Amino acid sequence: MTKKLFYFIAFLLVSISVSFTFSQRATAESYTSDFSNQLGTWEDLVGQVDRKISQGQLNIANQKLSTGYESISLNTDAGNRSSGDVQITFVYKGQTNFGLVFRAGTGNTKNYQSFAYMSNGNWQLGQPGGKWITDIHSQSLEIGQTYKLLLRYQGTSVKAYLNSKIIYDNPHVTYSDGSTINGDWTGATGLRLFGNLSQLLLLSLKTGEVNSIPEVLDTQQFINLRDKWKQQLITENYDSNNAPLVKYVNTLSKNAQTLYQSMNRSPERKELWPLKAGDTPSANLTTQFSNLYLLSQAYGTKGTDYYLNPELLADIQSGLDFMVSQKGYDGQKYYGNWWDWQVGIPQKFIGSLMILGDKLPSDKIQEYTKAIQSYVPNPYQQLYTKAQDVFVDLAFIPNFSTTGANRTDLALSVLGLGILQEDESKIELASNSIKEVFQTVTKGDGFYPDGSFIQHNNIPYTGSYGNVLVKGVGQILATTKDSSFEMDSQTVSNFVSTVEQSFIPLIYQGTMLPGVNGRSISRAPKDTQVGYGSTTMYNLLIVANLAPEESQKKLQEAVKYWMQTNPDYYLNNTRDYNDLQLTLSLMANTAITGDMLPFTGTKVFASMDRFVQNNPTYMTSLSLYSNRTSSFEAGNGENKRGWHTADGMFYLYNNDGVQFGNSYWPTVDPYRLPGTTVDTVALQDENSSFTTVTSPETWVGGAAAENQAVMGMALNKQGTKNNGTVLPMNLRAKKSWFVLEDQTIALGAGISGDTTASIETVVDNRLLNDAYHYQVISNKGNITDASEESKKDWLLLRSDHQNASIGYYFPTSSDVTVQSEKRTGTYAAINSAFPSDKTYSGEYRKFMINHGQHPQNANYAYVILPEATQEKLKNYTQDNTLKILANTESIQAVQMETAGYLGINFWAATGGSIADITTDKPISLLKQNKQTQTTYTIANPTQTNEIAHIQLPKDFKYILSMSDGVSFDEATHTLSIDFSGSAGSAKQIVVE
């Protein structure tokens, strides 16, 4: 065991060292470091230097010592040379007295040579002993700009280039005393700071043999990158026989005509277009740039009425000038929402510049990009949000680094700036900055090992911010593919794998599940758009285009499965030409059949308290919350009534075609969401800034395998806030769901609390399809009253359409209220940031169990049976195959022997005992019997790093397999499971 551990650690260390090779490479010929991963090895030859990596950059600063300010810091990883090339890329911040060191002898403070920028604006070349040449001139350095300084030295010859322009060329360097530069010295490369306290912000360091680093930029690569970006936005190849393309172009042309005709082109104008309803002042700026971008698309797309129209081009440029000079997007000041200035505007602005390209004067391109660069200096810095319509100086949040989708949004703009400014360092910075956003995390924002995606620290956001992240990363990787900036294949493969496991299980009929869309569920959809379906499909196609062959086919098969149910929808709702051509290519590819449901079975997303089950005819999902995950997010006037969306909300998708769709969120009763146990006391619309509410409880999660699962949630509403005020809620409950192939058994116990309203468990709250006919039937007959309450053994919501009926069985005859309710609403009522006054209506059927105002240890039990019929329900009630073994605060357990199913949630800190299974810790356990084999799937939903000891039934002889961290004591028949680092994921043992 000890030897194995030693070899494993040795292998791991070797693997780790290899993993850094992309960001820091050294060979006999060359060395490169972009400081994206590690600092490297440095040695102070003179003085003392502070070095740290922050936001993919090396910050290096000298200190004042008794000997003065002189400091020389050598990078020993770069090796020793007597001749070669050395290049640094740095951001100029107004500092002086800094430069390169070469041929530096380790340990000899008098044996080095230097090329440095001085306080008088000149450069100096020389070495200790008063041997300096100080009259080397270059263009003035401009604060905030990025520069590449390349030094080429060989014998007595020295050449220096600044941003590809030669500033010094001397084949035989001679000092004023007549001596020549020591060309035979061999030494290390480094950095020098002197004369005063100074800092240097370094983006990269490169060294190599003479002529190994090109002194002049390859401008063709920037042209190629710009063309690739441009071709994603427009097409210059128009085929009148391609019906979807013709429709796309005609729609673009029509939209452009509407915008162009309404554009204010007067010299005295105050706005280009009138303020759009709901726009804040900063959002209005984004809208104006978005309109100019659409006009740019029409100008560049062949087949529109405005293709290469010189009058439109002049008006677009005039509009851009107006927005920069008159509306304040000049790089100096800002107001309102940071997102508009750093994401919304730059992406549309850069898109316009990519399309217009060489149609605009080069000095205009530089003027525009310089303004954008002030707001987006790098992918890491984020501005504060300020008051609207009051200009203030740029204020970046100190000691802060962007994460997740915000990082990729900024990185995409930095990439665009790098291409337009022909700045390699910006392109490299953009690429390096996105690597960590799809590397898995264990806390905070990002993707987790189980596929969860978190943004804003504790909000499940795969469908919204996760989609933005994938789009941004995908576009960056697609743009740089087949260029010198292309990401290495392993990194791309890791990204693709992350996307596969994080997105595919969370999609139903092409739409992201609402439980992972955060506050975005309150945004009004476009008239033709369903949820986040089209956006997700297009993003997955972008990723598929980058993926290794096997993953590419998997993603394309998945997307085609969803798209081919309504291809016209996906062809007619594209964001740009790239979406259209990817969709057309997929639909025409006969090798991709799309005939298999992309995901079947169950999956627990423990790191965001979500669960899904997918079958060929229906899909279910659970939204829960804990001390790790917030119950909901409200902010920017969005999701004002999302209070109970994670109180155990149970999503059941079937063939009704309307559930959780466009009309659902503005019309559903927000106090009675399906699956929840709630205190229905009236709450105020949530208007506070980015509200999140976590629970005191840790026990949330479960265990899943194949198409079965057991899930649980310790519900605790104590500490719940409404607009910053702590509510007097004290509702508590233990809620469990036992999931089988064709049913979900829901148990509740320990339901206690006090309210002035009522505490209820919502069995279901179903939106009806207006085109379907429904009937509610109980074991006592048809229910036609608008509101009816009585004891019931079962209920059936019967539809005249296939796979749209649902049965509800109550194992212990329960008082169930049935209500019919017609509701109307608008998205404006739940979202003032993206308001829509369109009125939606919905007919609902509610099934509820009322626990009263002061329940103490109340409980419930019901079974949801998708696709049920009256006959199936009657048979189910008579079969007696369902056994509820326990429904208490300490244990909830269900057995279905005919399905080989046993599910147990042990709630107590000391565990418990039932069904010949004993544990000393709180766990969730799923036991599955198949012929002679039994599989135990066990999780610790509290996510504490504990060892659980579990005694199993003595009904097996052999252990076939065990997960890592699991051991078995045959003498006591006890499992020991180390849950350290499992983060809620389950362990398995298979026995026979």
Name what the model sees in each region.
Residues 257-524:
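Aromatic-lined, polymer-binding surfaces characteristic
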Residues 27-46, 214:
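Extracellular carbohydrate-recognition regions
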Residues 64-125:
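Secretory/extracellular carbohydrate-interaction modules
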Residues 37-68:
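Extracellular glycan-recognition surfaces and repeat-rich motifs
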Residues 127-148:
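Short, aromatic/His-centered strand-loop micro-motif at the edge of beta-sheets
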Residues 145-159:
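Localized edge beta-strand/strand-to-loop motifs within extracellular or lumenal beta-rich domains
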Residues 170-206:
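Flexible glycan-contacting loops in extracellular carbohydrate-active proteins
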Residues 476-935, 939-943, 947-952, 956, ...:
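Extended polysaccharide-engagement surfaces of secreted carbohydrate-active enzymes
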